[in-house]
Amino acid sequence: MNRRAALKTALLPFFAARVRAGASVSTLIGNGSPGYSDSQVNNPYGLCIRDGGLYFCDLDNQRIRRLDLKTRRATDVAGNGQRAYTGDGGPATAGSLNMPHELVFDARGNMYVAERDNHVVRKVDRDGRMSTLAGTGVAGFSGDGGPASRAQLRQPHSIAFGPDGRLLICDVGNHRIRAVHLSTGMIETVGGTGERLPTPDGARLKGTPLNGPRTIVMDHDGTMYLALREGNAICRIDAKSGTLHHLAGTGEQGYSGDGGPARAARLAGPKGLTLARRGVYLADTESHTIRRIDLDSGIITTVLGTGVRGDGPEPDPLQCKLSRPHGVFADANGNLYVADSESHRIRVLTA
């Protein structure tokens, strides 16, 4: 056994003690087989909690669904199950979606959905009517400085509200972050050059290459955190200066570094991000784990998963195997909801 492996083995009881102190994992919905029912999902992705319900992108069912956290009953919010681009101007449940990846709500209760394969961001208003906010339905890059509904996107994956209230879009296929002013409907590029190049530490977001900007989230103070999928890294974006700071990942794909500085750890295609209790939680998809970066110490640890693909067993978080998790969301109590995508489950890690 080499020195690094021996050290990791020696530290495992320490990690386990931290995670197991009252923590357990259980399944909220899903039984391990793909399907569409109150007990089944089919490749869940982005998710969030709102008004007593868990909203999630049921990717291969081409729907947005809501799971009532008390009754455990699932209802449709958007999508009719058909993989297409239809329904603008009508009820969201009558329209078609095409690989919905992530969703977010504004303060008024309107929902926004990033549809990867329609190359659009859709809006579902409080009355359940659907419209297209950004994108034309045709992949490309165009439209900056004009109406977002006439601009082209290429495989948008993630959306979030920035510190100034604009809706930020991770336009992954264009290696850019776009921003839509909701008051005017205009779109612009705020980060990325379109080049698939390494992202330098300490550079300004605007005009800097972004290697696969997959997910962006914002903290209460306006600080943003960005997952670079192809870059295998997490960056912090300063709210005032717009400067990118390298937070985690060496840039090389892998699964290593637990118990040490996050900057020295290897990540494996990070996708979902969420914030809670001075920590950044990430779905490290290709290592089949959920990892935590402590914002005070800079140390990274695994909080769920073993690093080996599988399905359970529960309830021990460090013995429960995952299968390519994509979505992760922390509620106000610190409970962590995980879209265990290819296990066809949504799990919750209780604080």
Predicted features, each with a name:
Residues L59, R116, V172, R229, ...:
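Short loop/turn segments immediately following the C-termini of beta-strands
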Residues D68-R72, D125-G128, H181-G185, D238-G242, ...:
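Short loop/turn segments that connect beta-strands within beta-propeller blades
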Residues G22-N43, R72-M99, R129-Q155, G185-G212, ...:
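Gly/Pro-rich loop segments of beta-rich domains
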Residues M1-F14:
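N-terminal secretory signal peptides and thylakoid transit peptides that target proteins
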Residues L54-Y55, N110-Y112, R166-L168, T223-Y225, ...:
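Conserved beta-propeller blade signature
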Residues I49-D51, F105-R108, F161-D164, M218-D221, ...:
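Residue-level detector of Asp-centered blade-edge/turn motifs that repeat once per structural unit
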Residues H326-A351:
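Blade-level signature of beta-propeller repeat domains, shared across WD40, Kelch, NHL, RCC1
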